[in-house]
């Protein structure tokens, strides 16, 4: 039996101060039900960064994984764009 494809998200690294961990902010646009206007919503995820390569301001892709700690359930897949 084939395992289903893991969910991936693209977001901005907001913090790289922890050892082998980065905080990634994912921003989505959602249509407001009453006013029919798009509203920005953001959520923060803790992601595992094995080589400590991501820096604050980088755009990264993260994927779901098994629980790695109390708050970490995502891992860094690739750095899409480096911070300037």
From Swiss-Prot:
<keyword id="KW-0694">RNA-binding</keyword>
<dbReference type="InterPro" id="IPR019979">
    <property type="entry name" value="Ribosomal_uS17_CS"/>
</dbReference>
<comment type="function">
    <text>One of the primary rRNA binding proteins, it binds specifically to the 5'-end of 16S ribosomal RNA.</text>
</comment>
<comment type="similarity">
    <text>Belongs to the universal ribosomal protein uS17 family.</text>
</comment>
<dbReference type="Pfam" id="PF00366">
    <property type="entry name" value="Ribosomal_S17"/>
</dbReference>
<dbReference type="GO" id="GO:0006412">
    <property type="term" value="P:translation"/>
</dbReference>
<keyword id="KW-0687">Ribonucleoprotein</keyword>
<protein>
    <recommendedName>
        <fullName>Small ribosomal subunit protein uS17</fullName>
    </recommendedName>
</protein>
<comment type="subunit">
    <text>Part of the 30S ribosomal subunit.</text>
</comment>
<keyword id="KW-0699">rRNA-binding</keyword>
<dbReference type="GO" id="GO:0022627">
    <property type="term" value="C:cytosolic small ribosomal subunit"/>
</dbReference>
<dbReference type="InterPro" id="IPR019984">
    <property type="entry name" value="Ribosomal_uS17_bact/chlr"/>
</dbReference>
<keyword id="KW-0689">Ribosomal protein</keyword>
<dbReference type="InterPro" id="IPR012340">
    <property type="entry name" value="NA-bd_OB-fold"/>
</dbReference>
<dbReference type="GO" id="GO:0003735">
    <property type="term" value="F:structural constituent of ribosome"/>
</dbReference>
<dbReference type="GO" id="GO:0019843">
    <property type="term" value="F:rRNA binding"/>
</dbReference>
<dbReference type="InterPro" id="IPR000266">
    <property type="entry name" value="Ribosomal_uS17"/>
</dbReference>
